[in-house]
Every structure is written in C-alpha cells, then in structure tokens.
Amino acid sequence: MRTNYCGQLNSSHVGQEVTLCGWVNRRRDLGGLIFIDMRDREGLVQVFFDPDRQDAFKLASELRNEFCIQLTGVVRARPESQINKDMATGEVEIFANALTIVNRSEALPLDSNQTNTEEARLKYRYLDLRRPEMAQRLKTRARITSFVRRFMDEHGFLDIETPMLTKATPEGARDYLVPSRVHKGKFYALPQSPQLFKQLLMMSGFDRYYQIVKCFRDEDLRADRQPEFTQIDVETSFMTAPQVREVMEKLVRELWLDVKGVDLGDFPIMTFAEAMRRFGSDKPDLRNPLELVDVADLVKNIDFKVFSGPANDAKGRVAAIRVPGGAQLSRKQIDEYGKFIEIYGAKGLAYIKLNERAKGLEGVQSPVAKFLNADMLSALLDRTAAQDGDILFFGADSAKVVTDALGALRLKLGRDLSLTKDDSWEPLWVVDFPMFEEDGEGGLAAMHHPFTAPRDMLPSELAANPVSAIANAYDMVINGYEVGGGSVRIHNGDMQQTVFSILGITEQEQREKFGFLLDALKYGTPPHAGLAFGLDRLVMLLTGTDNIRDVIAFPKTTAAACLMTEAPSFANPASLEELAIAVVVKGKAAQDGKSENE
C-alpha cells in the first residue's frame, strides 16, 4: 500500500513519486491552499494539496486530525525560506496527486494540544501510543532488545525459554496464582523470575544462557515497578563474579554507546558498607556531590543528649551533610526538610549555618551552637570541609534511621538545589552485601534470594554466625537506579540446606518446595553465577523518562489494573465451577460484584 515512510523522506527523494500511509497529524487551510502534516511511526512530513488537483483537493477539505489516509504524490524541495529545521523532513514536502480516506476518526478523547491525565492516556492507550514521543520510546525499546540479542549471541549465550506455569517458591513477593482445571484444588504460580530454571540449565550443561522474559510479582507498585515486567536474564557456568561483571559491563557500555553515543567508561566498584556510609543508599546516585560524613567521635562528650546519646551507642549514628551555599536557605525551607525526614523515623533536623568561620562561634547560626565549644565546632567544620556560606545538616539516631533519613535528604537537596548533574551518567557496581537482614519478626531473611552463595564460608561457619556472612552478590547501579543485580549461586547441597535452615525453612518444607533443586545438586553441579537486568528500567533511563509506564506498550496502573481492558475482572461462574473454585469476597467493592460469581 505504500512505498515509503513519512519520516524517512529527505532531499535525496526529490522528484520521486511516493505513496504514503498514515494519519493526519494537523490540517491547515491557507487562502485556498490545503496543507497537512502526515504522520506514521517514523515521523512527520508536510503534504500540499493544489486546487488544480480537484479530486484530491476536495477530499483534502474533508480531512480532520487522526483520519487514516493513503496518498500518492511527488517529493519536492521546499523553498529556502520555508525549510523547517525542527522537522527531520523539513527540507521537503509532498505535492499530492491522489488521496484516499481509509478511515475517518471521531472527535478524540485525548487532546494533542494539552497535557492529558495519565488515567485518560492509559484508558485510550492505543491513541496515546500514536504520539511521536511514545512511538519513539517503543522504537528505542525494540532497538535495545535487538542489540542485546546480538551481543548475547556473539558472546556464546543460548536463548532458552523457561516455563511460565510453574511452582510457587518463596522469592520475596507474593505470587500470581493460576488454578489448574485438570488438578482440582492445585495452582500454578507465574514466575517471579526464572531463577531456579536457569540454575537447572547450568546443571544441565548449557554453560551460557540468556532470555528476555516476562516476570510477575504481586507487590505494592511504584513509578518504576509493574506487576508484570521484563528481565534480561543471564546465567553462566565456570565464571567468577568479576568475570560475569566484566561481560555484563561490556554489554551495558556498548548499549549506551549505540543508543546514546555515550562512553560510560569503566564502572567503579563500591562495597555495600561504603555506599550506605557515604550516600545512605545501596544504589547511590553519584551525580549528586553531597555525602554523609560520620561525626559521632567528635560529639561524644557534647552536653546535648540528642547527639551524645547515639554517639555513645554501638547501634547509633551521628552524621552530617554539607550543602554548599546552603546558608541561604530560609528557616521555612529548613523546617520543611525537617518534616520530610520524619517519614524515615527521624525526630528532627539539627543544622549549622556557617556565615564566617574566622569569627568562630560568633560566625555561625545554629540551634545547637550553645552546646558547642570552639574546638568542637572547628573539628566539625574540618571533618565536613565546610566553607563560608555552607550549611551542615545533622542526623542523630539509630544507624538505620540516620542512614535512611540523610540518604533521602541528600537526594532531595540534590534535586531542589540543582546540585545533581542531570546531563551526566554515573554507573557503578555495588558489591559485598550482607547475606541476611532482620525480617522484623526476630528471624533472618535473605537480602537477595536464598540461592545466593556466601563469600569464603563453609556451611558450618555460616550456620555458626550467619549475621556476619557477606553475600557473593553484585548490583549494577546507574544514576541512582538499580538496573541489574546478580550473584554467585550456591552449588553445594549442604550449603543450600544450611541457608534454608537459617531462613527458618524446615526440612519438610525444603523437600516440598525445593526437593527438585536439592536433588539436582547431588549430580555434579558446576559453579555458576548470573545476573538479571530490568529491561523496563534500562529503557526508562535511555529514553529520559522517570516513569516505567512510559516505556511499556500496555502498562498497568499503580493499582495493578488495566484501564483500557478493565482487567482484572470477575470470572464467569461457569469457569469457576469448572475449576472447582468458590469465590469469597470481602469489602464493598468486592460485594458489588459478588452476584457475578454466585
């Protein structure tokens, strides 16, 4: 039906007759002449209708935005004065000879001339995706997946599919369950990741595996999370953690060079402990120059219990953030930052404004100045490298509260005061995570997942002191986003059972949930390691949006609903009966639909 795409026409096509298919993006009547901007997935081109071409001109007078059309015409160069440098096709236009209206459009529920609500955009997603910026994001996504497949193929990885209908295993989030019609009362689970299957593939001898795969997690959503998401899943045998990181870093560096024309350079490696200490986050945004500085040793003897209490507590922390030029902040702004960190459990935000260091205590403004002596103030200013015109913000509480609160405050200050370099890329690897963390109920939970191997420990040593264990795990972080995470896996049955026991999984539960894995570990399992990238998050970064829904064709809302198809919906009673399922509903919203299931 067509010979060319609209957005690919240029001066090399001048004089050629072309047939185009697409939509009317805009129509203009100029004193008896009709112009339209015609759009397809590749972009826009201007079309001119001459009154002398009566049939085409008459039809053109009927055109409205979003009519689907086909036209034939000749490409001609625009006069020098009419070249549009803002359009890729701005040097040419089409002189239309023939026009066909393929399909007319009703008045649109979305307004292209204003910002539409996200609810409207999701409800009419098929119209929203016609917008050039949305089309470009999905084209970039396709470019990324094609690039990844080529890279993985060139490096000897095999693309192997794993099951979508599988067994529920504890991986941190709730599973989406699928009832079995054949096996009454039993359920499949949609995979949260292909973790165990890719490990089994290593045990099968496939050596290098990858897959671009859908994963499902029934968890609370954020702007960068969806109930169904896509991973670039990777696993290798006989490769160490540094070797895995080397290949995956090469993939990402070459991807950024291909898509953005940016060389990311070598990725620095930072331990979890350093990241938390300096930045208050295990995914630090290194574009932001602010850092947390420990000062507990300097205020242990201060006559101010808010500081001295945590400073003398083994589980406490006192830290400061120096904000260059922050002495200009008003009391109202400072109070707002104090309220902000209350979200993270902080009880207040102490500060010191440094107006003129040469004046000592007389040169600062601070509600805690009366508790300081000259030597203590000087030590704090030296430790934080404070300069005249700066402000120091302090956190003093448990180590967790201070780290979380100041880590979040650091990011907010970076945004509010334009300290974060938005036009730069700062990747790194974060390594040496704790193997376990407290689960809030007196037990331990795996910080990554229960199949991660510890570093340099025997099963007996791990069982004796699990809290001290360091996981052989690694996360790739870019601009404060965790884009990928992985680890060396456990390839020893005794070690795997030890980890299960530490997590409170009984031997009976181990056999019921992981018997197939424990059996497989008996038969010459190779050492193996891997990683998974969040494809949606990678595309989000590479397209410059901060919302993952912008890079998924048909995403869900933060309530895990599809406004376009109205999923999820109540099931047909006959289907439920066939599955031998009775639905018990709770709450008014569910009660309103209960009759549909009875």
Curated annotation (Swiss-Prot):
Gene Ontology cellular-component terms listed: cytoplasm
MF terms in GO = aspartate-tRNA ligase activity; ATP binding; nucleic acid binding
The EC class name is ligase
Question: Quick check: keyword Transmembrane in the entry?
Answer: no
Q: Which reaction does it catalyse?
A: tRNA(Asp) + L-aspartate + ATP = L-aspartyl-tRNA(Asp) + AMP + diphosphate
Binding, L-aspartate: E171, R217, H448, R489
Quote the record's binding site residues for ATP. Answer: R217, D218, E219, Q226, E482, G534, L535, D536, R537
Q: What is its EC number?
A: 6.1.1.12
Q: Where in the cell is it found?
A: Cytoplasm
An example Gene Ontology biological process: aspartyl-tRNA aminoacylation
Keyword Nucleotide-binding appears in the UniProt entry = yes
According to the UniProt record, where is the region Aspartate? Answer: 195-198
Q: Entry's CDD domains? A: AspRS_core, EcAspRS_like_N
* Function noted in UniProt: Catalyzes the attachment of L-aspartate to tRNA(Asp) in a two-step reaction: L-aspartate is first activated by ATP to form Asp-AMP and then transferred to the acceptor end of tRNA(Asp).
Family annotation (NCBIfam families): aspS_bact, PRK00476.1
**Subunit structure, interactors included:** Homodimer.
Q: What is this protein called?
A: Aspartate--tRNA ligase
The gene behind this protein is: aspS
